[in-house]
Amino acid sequence: MALIQHGSVSGTSAVRLSFSSSVSPPSSSPPLSRVSLNFQSEKKSCYRRMICRAMVQDSVQGIPSVYAREMERLSAKESLILAFNDAGGFEALVTGKITDMQKIDVNERITNLERLNPTPRPTTSPYLEGRWSFEWFGVNTPGSLAVRVMFERFPSTLVSLSNMEIFIKDNNTKATANIKLLNSIENKITLSSKLTIEGPLRMKEEYLEGLLESPTVIEEAVPDQLRGLLGQATTTLQQLPEPIKDTLANGLRIPLGGTYQRFFMISYLDDEILIVRDTAGVPEVLTRVETSSPMSSSSVVENLEYNS
C-alpha cells in the first residue's frame, strides 16, 4: 500500500511484486510429497494475490464512489430548496396558496434527499442542536395547527405569520412563531418542550409551557384610523394595578405539564437541513438559521461509508 500512495508503481504491480518474489522456482525433479506442498503454497499465494488485488481495487474505486454520492446529496439539497422557492416559500405555505402539483413536487424531492441522509444516528448528533427555521410542514404538525387556529379567527388581511423557528439545546426546545397584526403590532408565541431519545432515529417531544409575549407596537405603521384607539388602550394599561401590568409585561404563561406529546423520526440531518416525520409520515423541513462549522471531508466519507 505504501507503493500505491507514493505513486511509484500501480496497485496490481505492487501486489504481484510483493508475493511473486516470495515463491522460489521448484527444483528439476522434486519428490511427490514436495510437489504437493509447493502446490498448496502456490494455491495459498494465489488466494493472497486475489484478496490483496481486491483490496487495492476497493480502495481505489471506493473514494470516487463516496464523493459521487456526496455530489448527488448536494444536488438533491439544491433541488429541494429550489422547489420551496418555486412554490412560493413559507408565506405561500401558511396562506394555503400552494397547489397540489407543487406539494407533490416538494414531497418527491424530500424523499430523494432523505435516502442520502449522511448522519446514521441523528438523535445524538451535535448537528441537531442550534436554531432552525420551518420551511415546510404538513397538515397535522404543530406548526400547521397553530396556523390553522390563527387564520380561523383572523382573516389573512389582518394577521400574518412571518416565520416560525425552533431552538434546540440539551434535549430542550423552544419554538417561536412571530405574528403581526394589522402590519403594526408584533407578537410572539413561544412553546417550550422536552425531547427524549427513543432510538437512533426516533424521539419523543413533551410540551411543557406556552408563552404569549407582550405585543410590540410599531407606532409609525399604525393606520391613522386606529391611532386614537391605540392611545386609549395605552392609557388604560397604565391605570391597571402593578401585578397585572407586570403579568402583561412578562407575557401570559400557560403551563402544559407534559399533557401533550408526540413522537417523530429524524429522516435527514446535516449542518444545513433537518427533516422529521411524525407518526403519520408527514414531513417537516427546517433549515439552519445559525451557521455552524461545515462537515469535514473525513466525516462525510465516514458517514457515507457507514450507510453504503
Swiss-Prot record:
Keywords: Chloroplast, Plastid, Transit peptide. The keyword Plastid applies. Coiled coil: none annotated. InterPro entries: PAP (IPR039633), PAP/fibrillin_dom (IPR006843). Residues 1-55 form a transit peptide. Signal peptide: none annotated. It is found in: Plastid, Chloroplast, Plastoglobule. The keyword Phosphoprotein does not apply. Pfam families: PAP_fibrillin (PF04755). GO terms for cellular component: chloroplast; chloroplast thylakoid membrane; cytosol; plastoglobule; thylakoid; thylakoid lumen. It comes from the Eukaryota. Belongs to the PAP/fibrillin family. This is Probable plastid-lipid-associated protein 9, chloroplastic.
